[in-house]
């Protein structure tokens, strides 16, 4: 017997669930420094967080939600990206904190587009804010800026007073790092929780991930790991330090241990 999704809405929900699971698997494989997962309560509502390591937004940590259309992925309507806190950016509305995806996609095509494309776009607007507002070059070689964006004030400041824009963004970055530790606004078990580094709690997980040769190569004089890591105050600095330690491993001809993929604690 042939079943149609029109007569069997439960089958449509099952198929939609498989699509969402496939999207989540792609997100895990394709991207770094940005995390997103469907909520436990509803697969059409995703929780996300991005750690920005480069550009004028470096050091920022932003939470956001992705809201998918009811008929995802068949619906041509674009997902809605809403940031949890105010973010100064030309493409983010200062009133409702939504990201404008219209400059990136005209419509959603289920055979071509995936949620990781949206996440990649989020990364790109923070990595290169100025590039995200340019449409090309004039005959004289000057950059042509978009006429309309969600936040025209942010656009004008970025174009006419870049130092002021950077100053405001860096103030915002400090605030974002403080807000990331706020209590979850929901009891959904899939909400992404970020915790400050705590030696007593986290060193045991480091012990599981790093072999004795790693510890020997990365020891800093007589300092305890917690004392040394206490001087690292940003995710970017942590990445830079890890790169330095990897170089030490190679210079000392110590084989690099196989590292398990660390997943965000949910």
UniProtKB/Swiss-Prot annotation:
Family indicated by similarity: Belongs to the ubiquitin-conjugating enzyme family. FTS subfamily.
Entry-linked SUPFAM superfamilies: UBC-like
SMART domains named among the record's database cross-references: UBCc
Disulfide bonds: none
Pfam families for the chain: UQ_con
UBC core domain span: 15-178
UniProt-recorded name of the protein: Protein crossbronx-like
Basic and acidic residues bias (residue ranges): 245-266
Region (Disordered): 226-266
Taxonomic source organism: Drosophila sechellia (Fruit fly)
């Amino acid at each position: 017997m042939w079943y149609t999704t029109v007569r069997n809405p439960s089958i449509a929900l099952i198929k939609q669930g498989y699509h969402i699971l496939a999207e989540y698997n792609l997100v895990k494989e394709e991207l770094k420094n940005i995390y997103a997962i469907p909520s436990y309560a509803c697969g059409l509502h995703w929780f996300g967080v991005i750690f920005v390591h480069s550009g004028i937004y470096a050091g920022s940590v932003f939470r956001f939600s992705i809201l998918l259309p009811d008929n995802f992925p068949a619906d041509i309507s674009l997902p809605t990206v809403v940031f949890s806190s105010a973010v100064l950016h030309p493409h983010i509305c200062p009133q409702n904190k939504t990201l404008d995806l219209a400059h990136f996609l005209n419509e959603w095509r289920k055979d071509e587009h995936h949620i990781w494309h949206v996440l990649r776009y989020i990364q790109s607007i923070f990595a290169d804010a100025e590039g995200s507002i340019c449409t090309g070059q004039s005959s004289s070689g000057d950059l042509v800026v978009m006429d309309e964006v969600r936040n025209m004030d942010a656009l004008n400041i970025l174009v006419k007073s870049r130092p002021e824009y950077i100053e405001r963004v860096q103030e915002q970055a400090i605030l974002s790092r403080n807000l990331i530790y706020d209590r979850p606004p929901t009891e959904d078990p899939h909400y992404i929780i970020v915790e400050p580094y705590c030696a007593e709690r986290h060193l045991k997980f480091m012990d599981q991930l790093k072999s004795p040769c790693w510890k020997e190569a990365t020891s800093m004089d007589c300092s305890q790991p917690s004392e040394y890591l206490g001087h690292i105050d940003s995710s970017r600095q942590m990445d830079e330090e890890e790169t330095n330690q990897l170089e030490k491993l190679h210079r000392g001809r110590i084989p690099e241990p196989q590292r398990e993929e660390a997943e965000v604690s949910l």
